[in-house]
Amino acid sequence: MKKQSFTFNLCAASAIVLATSSGQAAAQTPRANGETLGIQNYASTTGNMHAIIAKEKGFCEKYNFKCEIKILNSTSLGLQALVGKTIDITQSGADLVGAAVAAGAEVVIVGTSLPANVLSISVRNDVPVPSRDKGYPGIMNDFKGKRIGVSARGSSSEKHFNAMLKDAGLKPEDVTYVAVGAPSTTYTALAIGKQIDAAIMYQPLTQICQFNKTCETVIDMTIGEGPKSLEATIGANIVFAARKEMVESNPKLMEAFYAAMTDAAAWFHDPKNFDELVKIYTPIISFGDMAGADEMRRNWIKSVIPAYSKDLKVKVSALQEIMDFSLENKIIDVKVEAKRVLWDKAPQTP
């Protein structure tokens, strides 16, 4: 009887432990309340890969909220929509989020999407670049008097180009900016319509130029070319931002958002999912009837995956570098501390 009693007690104790552990796990699993989050994405690029995959693979639903993807092709347009409450999460350049905060907008950075700079400068083949061998910033003198394509007027791409002109002793007035939208329409304006001479743009403009041999990238900031100060900003360049009142009043939703986005990151960083990732992006990134489009798309997506954050952590020192850069280049007119722009509950590292 004693042996039977001991066995029974051991089984009962094990059952209690298992039940308790299961209950704790369930309690710890983030769960929203069925809300819908409008999240910014960009056309014709890999854009907001976290949100696209979270939606397509059911990670949003897993944590009981819906992801609604909305196309807005610049940080400035995304921030306008965020403040106007037509979207809830932007994928934005941290510099313009800081500018919005300095101007009085009640928005905060809630995570990092792409830690490093995503911009590059490409020129059409028939545009002379005599200072190329001088490197940066000397090469910037070749853009004086030229028409420069940017995603939208007032966007992060324009602000960065202004700062690069300054490094060469030039002014914004020394070039003419033209809003050209996404990489695909930028390519048309650059290489086919010739409405612009050069463009500062995110990928895949670099890849399209390389493939068609009609234009080339002369400064690629994604691989460390350009201003040396950019190295110190790695960790906070392209960020997720939201309205402060929204994140403060919806802690469960934000926990669910983080869980869904990090699940998405784990999924698209896993090599075994690459073919499915390409399949998801094929209708999003269309190269039309361009020969070799499938190969170019695969190679580009494969090359860009490592650029995306796995944990959404914001590097605070990098964010401060961006705020200081913004002040120095008159993107903002007052000093802004990183902690003022960053939500205190956002995943972060010093």
What is each of the regions a protein language model found here?
Residues 17-25:
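C-terminal segment of classical bacterial N-terminal signal peptides
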Residues 28-180, 195-203, 220-221:
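Short, glycine-/small- and polar/acidic-enriched structural segments
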Residues 48, 52, 79, 94-97, ...:
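Extracytoplasmic/secreted envelope proteins and their assembly/folding machinery
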Residues 319-350:
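Conserved C-terminal helix/tail region of periplasmic/extracytoplasmic solute-binding proteins
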Residues 1-11:
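Bacterial N-terminal signal peptides that target proteins for export
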Residues 62, 128-134, 223-233, 305-314:
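Short, solvent-exposed loop/beta-turn-alpha elements that line the ligand-binding surface or hinge
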Residues 247-331:
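Secondary-structure end/capping motifs
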Residues 185-283:
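Pocket-lining segment of extracytoplasmic ligand-binding domains
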